[in-house]
């Protein structure tokens, strides 16, 4: 996920660097001055309320302000537009043949034609600069103006309120002197529409890839969780089956196992007195603490690879541990049985034919263990029977 975000950021940066363009524009400081006839006082105003046109020279200019004579031609779109410059001698209209020779600035309204036409018409009448005031609905806003090919004529735009402020004394035939100077430089960066579409497509693509990756991730996680739950269920069944295996505690002096020679095949340590061992169906013996974790993970005997769980498939009932006392008649056997674990099912099936001591069953199990003595595994007995075994051996001689 982090790699995709880094790739997207790099892509956006590359797109921004290659497709972004910067727009440079300058504000105009507009200063006006006129004399109020009624009070004979000077009224001045200076605000950074103008904006230079894109193709206008960024220069300062000054002069008296003129405006279109015809109220229906305030936009200055007609080539024959006549301008009045208050304060001129004989109130002459500005034009090519006018006696007015000082620089003057045309004040026209926005709309009716292109900015370029307005500038051309005013320049043909001798204006050294053109001030265009915005529409009333735009309030105090100004916009960029494109007017290629207008030469050295300075062009600025002011807001509608500022235009009306300048127009008010002109309509009373009061000369207004204006000074335009360069204001603050502004740089505005923007991205083209094509770049925006490209970045949007790239972003959507990244989101789709990320969503697909998340869906894949959570599906895998769900499957893994389900498998874990299944494994836990199997582990519970395995533990339940392992609990049915016989347990025996090693006793000192037992002949079925040589404590000094025999060892657990899992931990490779010799059996010690009082060690608790588990007897598998294949008659192999291991430490309980060693073989139980092994069976939970592998289910097979470490030595003969017998599947212990399958071998215990017939042992479906919980185990019941019974103490079986070995009679003296079989005490001389090389292997003897101390405590043996049998299931409730076997106990019930043979309970009606055997006495409470279960002597016949113990004899059968003893013979079975003797047949497997060559595998060095045994069910061990109490050391108290050692003397009886020795006596039996002497009598046989």
UniProtKB/Swiss-Prot annotation:
The chain crosses the membrane at residues 196-216. Residues 351-368 have a biased composition (Low complexity). Glycans are attached at residues 40, 140, 231. It is a single-pass membrane protein. Residues 1-20 form the signal peptide. Residues 39-60, 341-397 are annotated as: Disordered. The keyword ATP-binding does not apply. One of its GO terms (cellular component) is membrane. CDD domains: PA_GRAIL_like, RING-H2_RNF149. Residues 39-49, 388-397 have a biased composition (Polar residues). It catalyses: S-ubiquitinyl-[E2 ubiquitin-conjugating enzyme]-L-cysteine + [acceptor protein]-L-lysine = [E2 ubiquitin-conjugating enzyme]-L-cysteine + N(6)-ubiquitinyl-[acceptor protein]-L-lysine. Its EC number is 2.3.2.27. GO terms for biological process: protein ubiquitination. Pfam families: PA, zf-RING_2. One of its GO terms (molecular function) is transferase activity. The RING-type zinc finger domain mediates binding to an E2 ubiquitin-conjugating enzyme. This is E3 ubiquitin-protein ligase RNF149.
């Amino acid at each position: 996920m982090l790699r995709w975000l880094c790739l997207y950021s790099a892509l956006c940066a590359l797109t921004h660097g290659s497709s972004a363009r910067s727009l440079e524009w300058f504000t105009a400081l507009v200063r006006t001055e006129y004399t109020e006839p009624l009070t004979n006082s000077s009224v001045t105003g200076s605000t950074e309320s103008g904006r230079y046109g894109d193709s206008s020279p960024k220069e300062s200019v000054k002069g008296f302000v003129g405006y279109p004579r015809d109220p229906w031609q305030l936009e200055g779109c007609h080539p024959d537009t006549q301008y009045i410059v208050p304060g001129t001698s004989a109130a002459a209209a500005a034009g090519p043949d006018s006696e007015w020779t000082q620089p003057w600035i045309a004040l026209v309204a926005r709309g009716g034609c292109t900015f370029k036409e307005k500038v051309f018409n005013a320049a043909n009448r001798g204006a050294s600069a053109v001030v265009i005031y915005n529409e009333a609905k735009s309030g105090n806003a100004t916009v960029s103006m494109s007017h290629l090919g207008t030469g050295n004529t300075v062009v600025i735009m002011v807001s509608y309120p500022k235009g009306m402020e300048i127009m008010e004394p002109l309509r009373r035939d009061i000369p207004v002197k204006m000074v335009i100077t360069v204001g603050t430089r502004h740089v505005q960066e923007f991205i083209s529409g094509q770049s925006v579409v490209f970045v949007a497509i790239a972003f959507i693509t990244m989101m789709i890839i990320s969503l697909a990756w998340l869906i894949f991730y959570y599906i895998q996680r769900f499957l893994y969780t389900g498998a874990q739950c299944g494994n836990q269920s199997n582990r519970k069944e395995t533990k339940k089956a392992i609990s049915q295996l016989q347990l025996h505690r090693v006793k000192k002096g037992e002949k079925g196992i040589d404590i000094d020679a025999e060892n657990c095949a899992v931990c490779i340590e010799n059996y010690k007195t009082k060690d608790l061992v588990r007897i598998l169906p294949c008659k192999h013996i291991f430490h309980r603490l060693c073989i139980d974790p092994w069976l939970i993970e592998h289910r097979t005997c470490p030595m003969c690879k017998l599947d212990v769980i399958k071998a215990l498939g017939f042992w479906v009932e919980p185990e019941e541990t019974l103490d079986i006392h070995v009679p003296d008649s079989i005490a001389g056997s090389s292997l003897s049985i101390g405590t043996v674990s049998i299931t409730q099912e076997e106990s019930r099936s043979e309970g009606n034919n055997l006495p409470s001591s279960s002597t016949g069953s113990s004899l059968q199990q003893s013979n079975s263990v003797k047949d497997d003595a060559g595998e060095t595994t045994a069910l061990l007995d109490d050391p108290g029977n050692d003397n009886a075994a020795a006596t039996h051996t002497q009598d046989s001689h």
